From Swiss-Prot:
Highest taxon above the source species: Viruses
Any single Pfam family the record assigns to this protein: Guanylate_cyc
Active site positions: 909 (proton acceptor), 1522 (proton acceptor)
Residue ranges annotated for the Protein kinase domain, each copy included: 786-1049, 1399-1651
Claim: ATP-binding is one of the keywords in the record: yes
Spans annotated as Disordered: 1089-1115
Magnesium among keywords: no
Catalytic activity line of the entry: L-seryl-[protein] + ATP = O-phospho-L-seryl-[protein] + ADP + H(+); L-threonyl-[protein] + ATP = O-phospho-L-threonyl-[protein] + ADP + H(+)
Signal peptide (residue range): 1-23
Annotated protein name in UniProt: Putative serine/threonine-protein kinase/receptor R826
Stretches that traverse the bilayer: 742-762
């Protein structure tokens, strides 16, 4: 079947504007290209959108002929083959290779036991020539002896295509010409066309289409067929393909190794900048014989109004060359990245593209190769240049230098001694060698008994050699003991030494074998200098690693191991020294330890050419010098040369670069005066076309910068006051000094008078301005300039709202403390805001403005669209966050914190809620500063601001006198790192007091399970645990954290990274292209969390503004399609609605059972949907997801029908609870034959077919389908019975005629809300044919309910024929649907569910443990509305809230607050209760005049006790856990009611969002985190008794920890002397330390009643 040429695959990315700036239309790039590249560009574009959302990139896949016709409007074109050079020159084109791919031979031979037949080149050529026609030909049998007997005597039917010469069809023909001379001759005679050859002429070869997909489908549907296709298209499909013998005679299969081998075979041609070659039939031993490279081409001379578009296109190309993560992603789709040297040459070609006569690409990409070093991961990442990116690839030092010969790298790094004379050839005569750093190479060991020791093991040369030669195999060997002191010897274990050997060519191998060869003739004779040594070890004495970075990781993970390794690699392995460097004992007995000092001495010896073998002056004997090798005069552009010069200078003279080097254990080379002089002279002579390139070149003189007597500014020396000359090399003469003195003597007095006058005028002006209207800073604004929108969050210091300021979306933090804001507090607030507005850093939230006048004090910040890191981690719509992205998040957060600390600001409240993410997933630190202001406000109301315990360092919890807040921030960061890898809430289930006690007393931290340790990089775990170490001095600084995370980002044991980029990270969010697909595959979610920081992008299908849409003719139906990566369907789709009927009645019947049933139903729907290839649309804002209704999208009608049928059948088999089945709506029903046709939830299903509009949610990375098609499907569902499937005529028409079950026409129906009547069909499931709907049943069917058989008259319903047309006599279908069922998600009809629009919100009257409390009205009744702080509640937890509200609604007691109902729609989830006019007991007692009488106090306490007793009377008891005066409410008649009970889960989660209160009322068993019962409420009541008695606050003046420890140590509030003894005795019993000694609340009521006999009990 030939692919219709009119069908075009379109991939479109529509990028939303940054939220903090005005919305702008970004550049639009349109490229057309081959169909084989659709998936490749889909991955490129969707992942690039996460990096750059200011550009829209469109890729249209089409035939080659259509590509050629499209070149006049396309910005670029993608072909499967290179355009010949002659056409490139003639048309002014430039092309870039993209990826390597494989063409495979696909076949369909039924009955074979093997999926991979074997073919050779000649046999394949003879098949296509027509000389081999049968599958059982002897040549094919000989190649496949295992299946020879299975090969059929059937003709091989060939599927070919004769597309344009830039297609894979042409590549296939050219490859066959190389494979077989027979084919080449026949092909020439046929005019170079498959279609003119014998197989086509004789009818057993047909044109199977240009696209690989078409040929694959043809092969699958054609027995005994054979064709060819690109492997990327074949790989995910179930089709057999052949392995081949290549040109070298080796059997190979298509994969990254064999294709990259083929590319490498032509590498020398590529390095000459010839990208027009084919790579099929490569000669390499491992090369796949039909390999190919696809290309992207464009004009080299753009002429257009806006050249930004050209730059954006080139940036996109550079990105997919440079970004490591996208390279890993495309490998999964069988696209194979180019060799790094080829990428470098291709990138250099970008600078040949011009726009309007100017070079389009100004950004410089420096591509470097060299030995894998941690410093070359950290330096490029830290060197932040907006115009330059450094990309560093690991290689051998010799390879890095060799690549300089062909300009295949911009520079190389070598750690071997560099012999410049060796390379002074015609190709490298201008070689420059700049020494950058030096480091120790050490004998490293991992002996657990030595961890934490201040002393190190000592080894001599002979012992080290004997270890490597297998002569010393035990750590307790006498040769080791002889070099160490008695203490060390006492610790030496009787354990086998495991030697770690790098079984791959490496510089370190060569260096240490050379070193030992110089020290020992025995080693030299046995092994000798080599970069791949071969040792003769017993198997249990060695561990091999083939990773160039693997020795370090192996050492740290292998106890009792040993190896030579660079010291920086050891430092970066772990915070605690698990792997340590041994000291060396020289031949004279001198012991030398590897330190900075011994490294410095060794460098000095090396520079002064001292033979270290003969000199023992305390220098470390084995070091390596890291040198940068480059072309001094012939780099390929001035810009590249200048960028490299800047980088070299930065590494040697920047403080940050030096700090990184020092942290990792490197010696910056320019510390040494000789190297300093050499490096500066190299920079001075570094030129391009005789122009100096360094920005300090003109300041360099005699190996100094400005003679060390001035500074270099803009390449000019600014001399000290006593120096002059071009380089400050001259001292100023005395005469000059005298003249200056005379001039100064005259000028200064005059200048002084003028300055005085100016100062007086300025002071007067300032005084005038202050007097009239005060000082106005640039950032000071009037509050009325802000337009406030939805509330985003609530904290201890106020609310955060989304808003608009001067047309820009912003976040506005309202400061709302008590009204006692003093002038000093106001001034402190203004002073601190002034400092914060000066801070600018990409990882710190931008402070934009502030209003500092009470009562409308606020801060205006940039709006962070994705909300907090905490929300992201809790968002189960994003079920998988790649570890690499987690590391990057941590790295960006640490950068922000390092900046703050460097600016003199400590955070003091660092937590995941205060790390915000913008729309591009960049992390920024927020809620810092205002330290003085917060302190002032806390002093006003200390109980309200007790802190966020989970992230608080122990020294702060214990209120140490001298706290280093920088290191306490590091502690908090450690908790955040734990959150990142677990996505859990720290200390979940523990009270704040329990957390504090456990952290301080027991050194308790969040649990890191063994499984987690095995899944997460040990370097990450080590860094995390060091951050939260109890001893602050052990904790790293944020600079060290940055460095260690930077190295971790590269997955290196020794150095942490194989390649790096200053602008492009290894994990540029790209794996989130998979998050969207995986999110819909979760069949067991806890639910769905949505973020109130929300943006929605919308697009129409079929338009050029589609977001990553791919339109194709791939709507092929499989009976039961199983997918692991489900793309969202586009184009015309089937919309399926499922809905639970009578859900409200079931929730009213038993909320607990209905919650569990709904969770089972949700899991079942999602599981079957995934198996059938469906996509779950985000639900509309009118209803929550998971409450009974689903909107599912299918691209194929048959898959949709399969889903419907499977769902209805499997619902009957669910293990529903017996309690649920008691209800008539969910009871079991059987047909007359005893077959169960109903059980449990009744679900109705409606279907419609058509186009939709799609909204994209960037937070969940999912799509919402809307529009008339969706509305119609929903409307059809509302008139459908439970258990019934109804579809529109559009669906019925698309249903395959081969389907065994035919839909039954119900006629034309009018549906409310749908303008036109619809012809509807019912789909009848044969297994459930006995179901009865609306008085009509199918032929020969009836049902039995409640085990009793009831006969029904047979009805004539002819299902034998099917027609999608309306019958001639159309009749009206009247569905007998009750009014309350004409509503989807009927769970919303519960009596206690309130429409939020019916609530009128009033003033805020309080802030509870899980919500902000407002006064309001509902249906003209005064109510209190508690709006949940946490609105991002996942699906299952929201069902739990629904269950709890249903239960609480049934509670009725005069001393329990009455639950009116709840609104359950985000973002307005709230509960509504009766309104209590006098507020809470605490406030009432404070404001009560006159003071309460004894009788009143007893009455209040009795009523409180009655309320608690009522809660405890349930089985199991309802435990309040938070009894205190602020949760006891009073009405105008002093009636007491208990509030704030229930919702334990929500309270727990909100404990991290609001600052916890003091633990005055908390029972000791809760603080100890012990098991507790309802007696904890009795304890709290005892404290309340004391408060009511004294009208005072308990533990007044004590801090959080003091109160906590007092409670644990049985210290209680002091009882007044005039307190009645019986009352005091009851209090003591209530607050007894042992819960078993406390009375019940019923006992309490009886005792209290004795004090006032007139009170009824």
């Amino acid at each position: 079947m030939r692919l219709n040429s009119q069908i075009v695959f379109c991939i479109v990315v529509v990028i939303s504007c940054l939220s903090m700036i005005e919305c702008k239309m970004g550049s639009r790039i349109y490229c057309s290209g081959s169909l084989s590249s659709v998936e490749l560009f889909s991955q490129y574009i969707s992942n690039y959108a996460l990096r750059n959302d200011d550009v829209t990139i469109i890729y249209a896949g089409m035939s080659v002929d259509e590509i050629n016709a499209d070149v006049y409007i396309a910005d670029c074109s993608a072909y499967d083959r290179a355009i010949p050079q002659i056409y490139m020159i003639s048309y002014g084109l430039i092309q870039f290779p993209i990826v390597g791919q494989a063409i495979v031979i696909i076949y369909n031979v039924p009955g074979l036991s093997s999926h991979n037949m074997i073919i050779d080149r000649e046999t394949l050529g003879r098949i296509w020539t027509g000389n081999i026609r049968k599958w059982n030909d002897i040549q094919i049998q000989n190649l496949n002896p295992d299946i020879a007997s299975q090969l059929p005597n059937e003709t091989i039917t060939l599927g070919y295509n004769d597309a344009y010469y830039l297609s894979i069809s042409e590549i296939m023909q050219l490859a066959l010409r190389n494979f077989s001379e027979e084919f080449a001759n026949a092909h020439t005679i046929a005019g170079g066309k498959f279609g003119n050859m014998i197989p086509a002429k004789q009818g057993y070869a047909i044109d199977a289409g240009e696209a690989s997909e078409s040929r694959i489908d043809w092969v699958k549907n054609t027995p005994f067929s054979l064709s060819f296709a690109d492997f990327a298209t074949v790989y995910p499909r179930n089709v057999s393909y052949m392995h081949m013998y290549n040109k070298a005679g080796k059997l190979v299969e298509p994969n990254i190794t064999t294709v990259q081998s083929a590319m490498a075979d032509f590498k020398e041609i590529y390095t000459t900048n010839d990208f027009t070659i084919d790579i099929f039939d490569a000669s390499g031993e491992n090369s796949w014989p039909i390999s190919w490279v696809n290309y992207i081409s464009m004009t080299s001379t753009f002429q257009q109004a806006d050249c930004i578009r050209t730059k954006e296109l080139l940036d996109f190309i550079a990105w997919f060359y440079m970004n490591n993560e996208i390279a890993e992603i495309i490998k999964e789709y069988q696209y194979y990245p180019l060799d790094n040297t080829i990428k470098k040459i291709a990138i250099d070609n970008m600078y040949n593209v011009t726009c309007n006569g100017k070079v389009s690409q100004e950004h410089q990409y420096l591509i470097a190769f060299g030995s894998p070093l941690s410093i070359m991961a950290s330096w490029p990442n830290t060197w932040a240049s907006s115009m330059t990116t450094v990309k560093y690839y690991a290689s051998l030092s010799d390879q890095a230098i060799e690549l300089q010969k062909t300009f295949s790298g911009d520079f190389g790094i070598t750690i071997k001694d560099f012999d410049k004379n060796k390379y002074l050839s015609s190709t490298m005569e201008d070689i420059g060698v700049s020494h950058l750093a030096a480091f120790n190479i050490v004998p490293a060991y991992n002996i657990p008994e030595f961890i934490g020791l201040n002393e190190t093991l000592v080894l001599n040369y002979e012992t080290i050699v004997d270890i490597y030669l297998g002569l010393v195999t035990n750590w307790n060997d006498s040769s080791i003991r002889n070099s160490n002191n008695p203490y060390i010897n006492s610790l030496l274990p009787n354990k086998t030494i495991t030697v770690v050997v790098q079984k791959v060519e490496s510089d370190v191998n060569e260096l240490f074998t050379n070193f030992l060869s110089c020290k020992s003739d025995k080693f030299n004779n046995a092994i000798g200098p080599t970069n791949l040594p071969e040792f003769d070890f017993v198997s249990n004495n060695v561990v091999y690693t083939e990773d160039v970075y693997g020795v370090g990781n192996t050492l740290v993970s292998t106890d009792y191991s040993f190896a030579f390794w660079p010291e920086p690699g050891i430092r970066l392995l772990s915070h605690m020294a698990i792997v340590q460097a041994a000291s060396i004992q020289t031949s004279t007995g001198t012991i030398i330890k590897p330190t900075n000092e011994t490294l410095s001495k060794a460098v000095d010896n090396k520079i002064n050419s001292i033979n270290r073998r003969d000199i023992e002056d305390g220098s470390w004997p084995f070091i390596a010098m890291m040198s940068l090798v480059y072309h001094q005069k012939t780099m390929q552009s001035f810009s590249k040369a200048s960028a490299l010069a800047d980088f070299i200078y930065w590494t040697q003279f920047d403080d940050t670069a030096a700090s990184i080097a020092d942290t990792q254990g490197y010696y910056v080379a320019s510390i040494h005066p000789t190297i300093l002089r050499e490096n500066l002279e190299l920079l001075q002579s570094f030129t391009f076309e005789d122009r100096t390139v360094s920005k300090v070149a003109n300041c360099i003189f005699e190996g100094t910068i400005c003679y060390n007597k001035g500074t270099c500014n803009n390449n000019v020396c600014l001399c000290n006051i006593d120096r002059e000359g071009q380089f400050c090399e001259l001292e100023k003469t005395q005469s000059d000094t005298n003249i200056v003195t005379i001039i100064l003597a005259v000028v200064i007095p005059i200048a002084f008078i003028i300055v005085c006058i100016i100062c007086i005028l300025v002071v007067a002006l300032i005084f005038s301005l202050r007097f009239r209207k005060g000082i106005s800073d640039d950032w000071e604004i009037d509050f009325h300039e802000l337009e406030l929108g939805e509330q985003l969050g609530t904290g201890a210091f106020g609310e955060v709202h989304k808003g608009t300021w001067r047309g820009t979306e912003v976040a506005v933090k309202m400061i709302s403390p008590d009204k006692t804001i003093t002038k000093d507090i106001e001034r402190n607030f203004k002073d601190e805001v002034r400092v914060m507005t000066t801070l600018r850093h990409p990882n710190v939230v931008l402070f934009m403005a502030a209003s500092t006048k009470p009562p409308k004090m606020c801060i205006v910040m940039e709006f962070m669209a994705l909300g907090s890191l905490h929300d992201l981690l809790k968002n189960e719509l994003i079920p998988d966050i790649p570890f690499a992205l987690k590391v990057k998040i941590a790295y960006q957060a640490s950068k922000g914190m390092h900046f703050l600390h460097s600016s003199g600001i400590t955070h003091r409240d660092l937590k995941s809620l205060n790390l915000l993410l913008d729309i591009k997933w960049n992390v920024k630190v927020s809620d810092f500063g205002l330290t003085k202001f917060k302190s002032d406000v806390k002093s006003i109301n200390p109980e309200k601001f007790a802190g966020t315990i989970q992230w608080t360092a122990p020294e702060i919890l214990s209120e140490d006198r001298e706290v280093d807040y920088i290191l306490s921030d590091v502690y908090s960061f450690g908790i955040i790192m734990w959150e990142l890898i677990t996505r859990d809430q720290p200390y979940f289930g523990m009270s704040p007091a329990a957390i504090a006690v456990s952290v301080i007393r027991d050194n308790y931290r969040p649990v890191i399970s063994d499984q987690l340790r095995s899944e997460v990089a040990p370097e990450y775990i080590e860094l995390l645990t060091s951050c939260w170490h109890f001893d602050p001095t052990i904790r790293p600084t944020f600079l060290e954290i940055m460095t260690r995370l930077s190295n971790l980002m590269g997955d290196s044991g020794m150095t942490g990274m194989s390649s790096s980029s200053s602008n492009s990270s290894k994990f540029d969010y790209n794996s989130f292209g998979k998050v969207q697909q995986f999110a819909i595959n979760r069949t067991d979610p806890d639910g769905i969390v949505q973020n109130s920081y929300n943006r929605t992008d919308s697009y129409d299908l079929g338009s050029n503004n589609s977001h990553s849409s791919i339109t194709s003719d791939t709507n092929k139906s499989n009976k039961y399609l199983r997918q692991t990566n489900i793309q969202h369907p586009t184009g015309e789709v089937v919309v399926v609605f499922t809905d639970i009927i009578s859900a409200a009645q079931l929730w009213e019947f038993d909320a607990s059972e209905m919650k569990n049933a709904t969770i089972l139903y949700n899991k079942l729907v999602r599981s079957i949907c995934n198996e059938c290839g469906g996509y779950e649309s985000l639900i509309s804002k009118e209803r929550n997801s998971g409450e009974g209704s689903f909107c599912l999208i299918f691209s194929d009608v048959q898959n949709a029908i399969t889903f419907c049928e499977e769902l209805q059948k499997q619902l009957v088999g669910v293990n529903w609870s017996p309690k649920l089945l008691e209800h008539p709506i969910t009871a079991i029903e059987k047909d007359i034959n005893g077959t169960i046709i109903y059980a449990g939830l009744r679900v109705r299903i409606g279907l419609h077919f058509g186009s939709t509009k799609i909204n994209y949610d960037p937070i969940s990375r999912k799509y919402e389908y809307i529009g008339p098609t969706v509305t119609t499907a929903a409307a059809v569902t509302t008139i459908t019975h439970g258990g019934q499937i109804i579809m529109t005529e559009d669906v019925a028409n698309k249903l395959s005629t081969e389907n065994s079950n035919k839909p039954v026409c119900l006629g034309r129906v009018d549906i409310d809300g749908i303008p036109d009547s619809l012809v509807l069909y019912e789909y009848v499931i044969s297994a459930l044919i006995g179901r009865f709907f609306g008085g009509v049943t199918r032929k020969n069917a009836s049902f039995v309910s409640n085990e009793t058989s009831t006969d029904y008259d047979d009805m004539d319903t002819d299902n034998s024929t099917f027609s999608a047309r309306v019958p001639h006599q159309a009749y009206q279908y009247h569905a007998a649907i009750e009014n309350n069922e004409r509503y989807l998600t009927s769970a919303g009809l519960c009596s206690w569910v309130i429409n939020y629009d019916e609530i009128k919100m009033g003033e805020q009257i309080g802030l509870g443990s899980y919500g902000v409390v407002y006064r309001g009205k509902w249906k003209n009744v005064d109510v209190a509305i508690k709006k949940f702080i946490k609105q991002k509640i996942d699906e299952n937890h929201l069902l739990g809230i629904r269950e709890e509200i249903a239960f609480l609604k049934k509670l009725h007691h005069p001393n329990i607050i009455t639950m009116v109902g709840a609104s359950l729609k985000k973002p307005n989830i709230c509960i509504v209760t009766e309104y209590m006019a006098k507020g809470n007991l605490r406030d009432a007692m404070r404001t009560c005049t006159p003071k309460l009488e004894w009788h009143q106090k007893i009455k209040i306490l009795v009523n409180i006790a009655k309320g608690i007793s009522y809660l405890h009377s349930f089985d199991p008891p309802i435990i309040h856990r938070d009894i205190k005066p602020s949760n006891i409410l009073i009405d105008e008649n002093w009636n007491v009611k208990i509030a704030d009970f229930g919702f334990a889960r929500i309270k727990e989660e909100n404990a991290i969002m609001t600052r916890c209160g003091t633990p005055c009322w908390t029972a000791p068993e809760i603080i100890r985190n012990d098991i507790y019962d309802e007696k904890v409420d009795v304890f709290s009541f005892g404290i309340v008794m004391w408060e009511v008695l004294t009208c005072k606050e308990p533990f007044i003046g004590a801090n959080f920890m003091k109160i906590t420890m007092d409670i644990l140590e049985d210290v209680r509030p002091k009882i007044p002397q005039d307190c009645p003894e019986e009352f005091a005795k009851l209090m003591r019993k209530c607050w007894h330390a042992k819960s078993t000694k406390r009375p019940t609340m019923d006992d309490v009521i009886i005792v209290l009643a004795k004090f006032c006999p007139d009170i009824s009990v």
